[in-house]
Design a protein with these regions (language model features):
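Intrinsically disordered, metal-sensing/regulatory segments
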Residues: 1-232
Length: 232
């Protein structure tokens, strides 16, 4: 199979997991209960753990390898600042789409990076795709629940999944010979994800007199550790 078709399929699947997460949220008709509340908090922290693993094992290591100290610091801090400004802007708008916007804000640069690194290192490309898929599932689940006033929630998530192949193919053709730009984008995304985790996800892990939900973060990070282990 031509490499570009592999990129299209892999990046599309990575985006489709957000839709799968939304479908799970849609078919959930159970009554609110302590168990359900723990599960929902656990899904949130699972996504946080996977995001941290993506930063630790896929995004920042590429920046450390390809960038000197100053560009590395600038891109990482810029990513955090950009997500901070986006978060502030959404709060001013009182937007019910913060989780969905955050999903797109980290998915698109990651997909561009996926396409860019695939030509030089398909193994890293598949590894990055696995991280994107794992993080998009709980993000899609949470985004669907957040968009409770929107009548076309699944359509939005399906449309978001199609942005993956577009971004990945763009990265493949435009950035495959620009490893430093690709590494900068990955580090930028890493900084943004770190902001997202500690601003939005970690505070939601706290549930009074319940101690299991934060273990979702450990499980999510373990998924990343196992991916790194088997990749090597």
């Amino acid at each position: 199979m031509p490499e570009v078709f592999q990129i299209i399929l892999v990046s599309w699947f990575a985006g489709l997991t957000a839709l799968f997460g939304g479908l799970i949220a849609r078919i959930d008709r159970s009554q609110d209960s302590e168990v359900k509340n723990e599960f929902l908090h656990g899904m949130t922290t699972l996504g946080g753990g996977v995001l941290l693993a993506a930063v630790a094992f896929a995004l920042v290591p590429e920046g450390i390898e390809k960038l000197s100290a100053l560009p590395l610091c600038i891109t990482l801090l810029s990513g955090g600042l950009a997500f901070c400004l986006l978060d502030w802007w959404l709060s001013q708008k009182s937007s019910p789409r913060a989780q969905f916007t955050a999903l797109l804000a980290d998915f698109i640069p990651e997909a561009i990076s996926l396409g860019a690194v695939f030509a030089a290192d398909p193994k890293l490309g598949f590894f990055l795709a696995a991280f994107i898929a794992a993080q998009n599932f709980p993000e899609g689940f949470n985004a669907y629940r957040e968009l409770n006033q929107h009548t076309k929630r699944l359509t939005l998530l399906a449309g978001a999944s199609l942005l993956g192949p577009v971004a990945a193919v763009s990265g493949y053709y435009v950035l495959q010979d620009s490893p430093q730009i690709t590494a900068s984008m990955m580090t930028f995304a890493g900084g943004g994800i770190l902001y997202l985790v500690f601003q939005d996800i970690a505070p939601q892990a706290k549930l009074e007199r319940h101690w299991l939900p934060p273990l979702g973060a450990v499980l999510g990070f373990l998924i990343g550790v196992m991916g790194q282990y088997f990749m090597h």
